[in-house]
């Protein structure tokens, strides 16, 4: 070979898809947005279910945290076709955006994102349009309640079976809980707990039947609170303080070792692999931009 002769250039794009997937599967998902801009082929492979399957075989799966956010000025933009007033449910790899609204139009539609490929599909719509509904999941079913003004004892809650892909209304536990459109719900102790803001009562669903819950009202069901269950311990955030519920003593106990959270802005608790994630808003007065930490 002459000294002036150039060696043939071989790039990763010359490889077969299976080999490229094997390489991409070893790269952290935090780098996927940048890699997807390299070429259309990378973009397609990074959004494929085959990539997730390859990562699973290689033992390279990662936990990812998703935050519903309306701003378009973010690095990784995965926007729901519904608005931020939709209820969010997670069942397996799927993230469901339920209801919501566009301006004054309340929606009954349900959109499902496959977190493995970040692709959206439409699911069967609810029977009643709902905005800001309370959503809870249990045993592959999604419980949706409240979120509209024309509720009655027959339509206050509906349940979506993710296996049969069907909706059905659930009978109200008692006339005592019915009233208003605002409810809080949480999956706790293997069942669904529901609290009515207007009536200030709590019920739980057990083996298809409702019963009054003996949970202390002090700390449960306050508007604006955020709830999170980790290893069957229920945590609540209210007035920017985090507490946990002691079912034996029926009292809420302050969580020690955590400094007070900022007073100006919402706080959100979430389960991240049996660890609690705390999100709060930070307001910067200089340019009036809202930041999430």
Curated annotation (Swiss-Prot):
One of the Pfam families matching this protein, by short name: F-box
SMART domains given in the database record: Kelch
Keywords, ordered alphabetically: Kelch repeat, Repeat
F-box domain mapped to chain residues: 9-55
Kelch repeats: 94-140, 141-187, 226-272
Taxonomic superkingdom: Eukaryota
InterPro entries for the chain: F-box-like_dom_sf (IPR036047), F-box/kelch-repeat_ARATH (IPR050354), F-box_dom (IPR001810), Kelch-typ_b-propeller (IPR015915), Kelch_1 (IPR006652)
Xref: PANTHER family: F-BOX/KELCH-REPEAT PROTEIN SKIP4, GALACTOSE OXIDASE_KELCH REPEAT SUPERFAMILY PROTEIN
Protein name, UniProt field: Putative F-box/kelch-repeat protein At4g34170
């Amino acid at each position: 070979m002459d000294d002036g002769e150039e060696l043939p250039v071989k790039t990763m794009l010359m490889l077969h898809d299976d080999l490229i997937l094997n390489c991409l599967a070893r790269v952290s998902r935090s780098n996927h947005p940048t890699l997807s801009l390299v070429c259309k082929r990378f973009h397609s492979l990074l959004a494929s279910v085959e990539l997730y399957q390859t990562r699973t075989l290689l033992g390279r799966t990662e936990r990812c945290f998703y935050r519903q956010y309306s701003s378009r000025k973010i690095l990784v933009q995965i926007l729901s076709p519904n608005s931020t007033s939709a209820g969010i449910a997670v069942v397996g790899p799927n993230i469901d955006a339920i209801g919501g609204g566009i301006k004054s139009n309340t929606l009954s539609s349900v959109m499902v994102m496959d977190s493995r490929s970040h692709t959206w599909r439409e699911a069967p719509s609810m029977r009643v349009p709902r905005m800001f509904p309370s959503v809870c999941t249990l045993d592959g079913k999604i419980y949706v309640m409240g979120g509209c003004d024309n509720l009655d004892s027959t339509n206050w809650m509906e349940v979506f079976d993710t296996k049969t892909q069907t909706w059905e209304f659930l009978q109200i536990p008692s006339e005592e809980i019915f009233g208003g459109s605002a409810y809080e719900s949480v999956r706790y102790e293997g069942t669904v707990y529901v609290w009515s803001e207007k009536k200030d009562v709590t019920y739980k669903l057990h083996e298809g039947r409702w019963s009054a819950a003996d949970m202390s009202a002090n700390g449960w069901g306050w508007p604006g609170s955020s709830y999170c269950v980790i290893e069957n311990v229920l945590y609540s955030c209210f007035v920017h303080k985090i507490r946990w519920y002691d079912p034996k003593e029926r009292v809420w106990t302050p969580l020690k070792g955590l400094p007070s959270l900022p007073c100006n802005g919402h706080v959100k608790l979430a389960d991240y692999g049996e660890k609690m994630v705390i999100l709060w808003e930070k307001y910067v007065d200089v340019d009036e931009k809202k930041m999430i930490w």
